[in-house]
Amino acid sequence: MRVAIFSSKNYDHHSIEKENEHYGHDLVFLNERLTKETAEKAKDAEAVCIFVNDEANAEVLEILAGLGIKLVALRCAGYNNVDLDAAKKLNIKVVRVPAYSPYSVAEYAVGMLLTLNRQISRGLKRVRENNFSLEGLIGLDVHDKTVGIIGVGHIGSVFAHIMTHGFGANVIAYKPHPDPELAKKVGFRFTSLDEVIETSDIISLHCPLTPENHHMINEETLARAKKGFYLVNTSRGGLVDTKAVIKSLKAKHLGGYAADVYEEEGPLFFENHADDIIEDDILERLIAFPNVVFTGHQAFLTKEALSNIAHSILQDISDAEAGKEMPDALV
């Protein structure tokens, strides 16, 4: 099958082409994001493969359907950028990679928490300037702290295991449909969203973005949280109202923010803007805080995850071509 792969980078080329040796699909790698302006680049393809910041809204899907596209394969777990209702009406199948490597993101979230809490980035910067002073670098033990997790799927459960068994933290968690057996196995406690917000020393987000939880971390929830708490977001930028985070940081209520995602990351992330003037004043203000650790959506980026993603999407494409059932299908 001929597949147009949007938002592709060198690491995508390597992992997907290597895995494709076992499948033999005709792959067309495109650097551009999928938008209504670039959708025509999928001409002559039968499927498109997209990533987190590609746009697959109704307008784009109509263009793709007109080109004869029958399959949209997401090389990620989240699918908030795809209009599933429109895809269904247009008879376009949509598949995702639900569990490519929960360890990659969970381990990265731990790394971000430690970098924020122990001020590792500031320490590294100091010693490179021959400054070995420790003033202002005091952190906290994660051990025995209350760690609240919002969203306990594959990634959230791995993060909970690390916090519980690796750090000896008191882990509480919220998800709409709790799994008591999982909580017992890992060693944490399910509770209400209110308790997670109000009693946690550290809150880590591990849930998909939906219309219902957009800006679930906002001015009101931040005000209810413990003074000095840390917030970690490796899920989706839209879960957090960035303006509210900035306000809470300025008021010294939020102790620190570690994020690998940003609500308006689409036109910025995965590209080199070193010589550009960034016009997003909210982002520029956010990353200026000394108690903010911010990276460009790299939590997924491990060799194992890339290999698993490549295998999953190519297998789904092969199954679609053969008319087989696809376990990871959304539509």
UniProtKB/Swiss-Prot annotation:
Annotated Pfam families: 2-Hacid_dh, 2-Hacid_dh_C
Active site: R236, E265, H297 (proton donor)
A single MF term (Gene Ontology): D-lactate dehydrogenase activity
Enzyme Commission no: 1.1.1.-
Family indicated by similarity: Belongs to the D-isomer specific 2-hydroxyacid dehydrogenase family.
UniProt keywords, alphabetically: NAD, Oxidoreductase
PANTHER family from the UniProt entry: 2-HYDROXYACID DEHYDROGENASE HOMOLOG 1-RELATED
Gene: ddh
Broad class of enzyme this protein falls into: oxidoreductase
Protein name: 2-hydroxyacid dehydrogenase homolog
InterPro entries, A to Z: D-isomer_2_OHA_DH_cat_dom, D-isomer_DH_CS, D-isomer_DH_CS1, D-isomer_DH_NAD-bd, NAD(P)-bd_dom_sf
Binding, NAD(+): H154, I155, T234, S235, R236, D260, H297, Q298, A299, F300
Gene3D superfamilies in UniProt: NAD(P)-binding Rossmann-like Domain
